[in-house]
Regions:
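Auxiliary, metal-adjacent structural segments of Zn-dependent hydrolase domains
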Residues: 46-108, 125
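N-terminal Sec-pathway targeting helices
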Residues: 1-14
Length: 260
């Protein structure tokens, strides 16, 4: 009964989020930042925030990202817990079936500061490309989850790590470069909160960043890695593990036969 109530609450929250995003995007057309986000940034993060300069800078960045097309919408606006998450670097896939990616005002403020940086190492812009690729991979692999307990958590972990590989590939970055950017821009600034995130398997459907970066060492989502993630989530059901491998394991690339 409690599980059914939780499902209903989640569906209601998703519906409310969809309504909010629909209204926000309708108000702003193809704009990339909500008025609420602008107000939050000026009040909490950067009083000198210049919206027009920000738009110009972001559009230049987006033109360099080849996996986005003319139908993709990048939208900076508060979401989820408005009191805690807005200054951090968080993202969400937005509406299922649409190429909308939602980012917190913290992203807008950090990228805005980058537009003034003369000798930047590009860590934040590379991380931005990786995160967009990660969220876009989520959209491509989207499927409803009708599971509970550890199996639901396990699928959450598999989705995140699979989308990490997708983000690395789409952004044309190495796992080493993404790791450097994460450690500088997120773990270095928000490490205490992020390092607690998902360390207890049953609490969160996300693994820790440390766990995710460890998985990247395989270079791709192998069947062995999928099986190990399942085991780390406490899954003993071998049929379930085999099913997850069929869904999430990348097929090895066959070498081309020599001509002649």
């Amino acid at each position: 009964m409690r599980d059914l109530v939780m499902i209903l609450l989640i569906l209601i929250l998703i519906a409310l989020l969809c309504i909010y995003l629909h209204i926000s995007l309708s108000w702003h057309g193809i704009d990339i930042i909500s008025l609420e986000a602008e107000e939050y940034i000026r009040e909490k993060l950067d009083p000198a925030f210049d919206t027009e300069r920000f738009r110009i800078y972001i559009n230049k960045l987006l033109q360099k990202i080849d996996f986005l097309d003319e139908n993709s919408v990048i939208f900076f606006t508060p979401f989820y817990d408005r009191k805690k998450s807005q200054s951090s670097l968080n993202a969400h896939t937005g509406l299922p079936g649409q190429k909308v990616i939602i980012l917190t005002p913290g992203w807008a403020a950090r990228l805005y500061r980058e537009s003034f940086a003369g000798n930047s190492d590009g860590a934040i812009t590379d991380l931005f490309a990786f995160v967009l690729g990660h969220e876009m991979t989520h959209k491509e692999q989207h499927r409803p989850i009708f599971l509970f307990g550890r199996k639901r958590v396990c699928v959450g972990w598999l989705r995140e790590i699979s989308s990490d590989f997708g983000g690395i590939k789409k952004s044309h970055l190495s796992a080493k470069r993404v790791k450097f950017c994460l450690e500088k821009e997120i773990l270095g600034k928000e490490g205490r909160r992020q390092r607690r995130y998902g360390t207890k398997t049953m609490l969160r459907p996300h693994p820790t960043w440390e766990y995710r970066m460890k998985c990247w060492k395989t270079g791709r989502m192998t069947g062995e890695l999928v099986d190990q993630i399942c085991r780390d989530c406490g899954i003993t059901d071998s049929r379930f593990r085999d099913k997850m491998k069929r869904i999430y394991a990348e097929k090895p690339v066959k070498p081309m036969k020599p001509a002649g």
